[in-house]
Swiss-Prot record:
Pathway the protein takes part in: Amino-acid biosynthesis; L-histidine biosynthesis; L-histidine from 5-phospho-alpha-D-ribose 1-diphosphate: step 4/9
Protein name per its UniProtKB record: 1-(5-phosphoribosyl)-5-[(5-phosphoribosylamino)methylideneamino] imidazole-4-carboxamide isomerase
Superkingdom: Bacteria
Primary subcellular site in the record, as a coarse category: cytoplasm
Location(s) in or outside the cell: Cytoplasm
Cross-referenced InterPro entries: Aldolase_TIM, His_biosynth, HisA_bact_arch, Isoase_HisA-like, Isoase_HisA-like_bact, RibuloseP-bd_barrel
GO terms assigned for molecular function: 1-(5-phosphoribosyl)-5-[(5-phosphoribosylamino)methylideneamino]imidazole-4-carboxamide isomerase activity
Active-site residue numbers: D8, D131
Amino acid sequence: MEIIPAIDLQNGEAVRLYKGDYDKKTVYSKNPLEIAQKFEQMEAKYLHLVDLDGAKLGQTRNLEIVRKIKDQTNLKIEIGGGIRNLDTVSLYLEQIGVERVILGTAAAEKPDFLKELLVKYGLSRIVVGVDIREGFVSTSGWLEKTTLPYLSFLKDLEKIGVKTVIVTDISKDGTLTGPNFELYDEISKETSLDVIVSGGVKDSSDIQRAADSDFYGIIVGKAYYEGKINLEKEFNHANKKNYPLS
């Protein structure tokens, strides 16, 4: 299992939202590149980036920061937020060279487009972000709740050929109250998808719980920024246990 640190980008800054609310924002740094470099020094392998402006508006607004992080670190980058057409996917994967892109809204609204990307780029480079609010999938930066029950949607993704999903319980995100492990356990039981846990991580016990359940990965954001988790210690422990993320 891989521990994946997160940087959420808005207006060129590193921020965190509370339960996906754009009006409840905390700014942690005006220099996201410095944070990424610090993660690299801690021996992180992957970095989870979210373009919050992109997620809300459907346009890439933090492109140059993503490019700088890719050029000035050796971190393997996954990026999500506003990736809704082939040009944007191509920009990230082919021009900037990130390792994988995360589709959310596009995956829910355009399954044929998702299939096209899986064929063109392969299963390892296309990840689907499944954001859940009150049992249903949410889109457009968590602002729109669909009528798609999350488990049905996940099973549809599996049929299409998706391999990896990042699942977020929006009610947990940014709360430091612990992930909704019942949700993740259910998904693992009902599908064969590789599940990355996202939202609500509060301390190292959550990382251990995810590892014990053999989840594919866990994303850590606010718990690090608020000093609740010593990521350097966690990376060292994970590297010794040899949890690879292919």
